[in-house]
């Protein structure tokens, strides 16, 4: 007899666990706040290390399929200074041990490997409490609840399960990251595409930096990093349709005055 497992969160961790349990004949149900697998973008490239992530995929029986998703050339690395001068370069020779893959593609692989109905979409957890004797109750935003003999929290930074084990809460660490995308970069943004190369780019300075990854289809996915007080970024909501994104972009770009144009274009020419 096995105890059904309840997993909160259909991210990579929760789905990998559900798949490994399925391989071993242990039923699990995954509850996810998002309405569907395509409710939002799923982030950029992930490097899956040989000593942990790939081991989990082997246990899940999905390693061969994972290899088919690998972005060839994605382990290449370029480091530039603020003037665009190459400081360090490491090509992808095909012998690396941390291949890059799109997070969304890996998530879909995991979803497709699970029995229909394993993931319950649109179930946002509002509370979790112990019932004693190893059982727990999970309450959802729609007022419904489930009880379970084994509860796993895989629901990220703002986990509703973690408080059962720890009083720790996320705290502002002193830096913010702003994401941008450039599409069809080789044709439309050739200077930036050349700067990034075939894999990852790092252009860092004290208190700030520009990091970018090349994704399949000529997409450049950039993270602009700034250190500073939380108040600097509070009140800016780039997802709000009423936000003047041009003004916000200009405000952030001002912090990179004097940087090489092929680097700042990763921010100022961003299409999202």
Task: Tell me what each language-model feature is.
Residues 6, 29, 221-223:
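A structural signal for isolated positions on well-ordered beta-strands in alpha/beta enzyme cores
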Residues 26, 62, 261:
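Short phosphate-binding/catalytic loops that engage adenosine nucleotides
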Residues 1-13:
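Beta1/beta-strand and adjacent pyrophosphate-binding region of the FAD-binding site
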Residues 2-5, 20-22, 47-185, 229-239, ...:
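Conserved N-terminal helical subregion
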Residues 194, 198, 205-208, 214-216, ...:
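FAD/FMN-dependent oxidoreductases across multiple families
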Residues 130-133, 213-217:
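Short beta-strand micro-motifs enriched in acidic
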Residues 8, 22-42:
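Glycine-rich FAD pyrophosphate-binding loop
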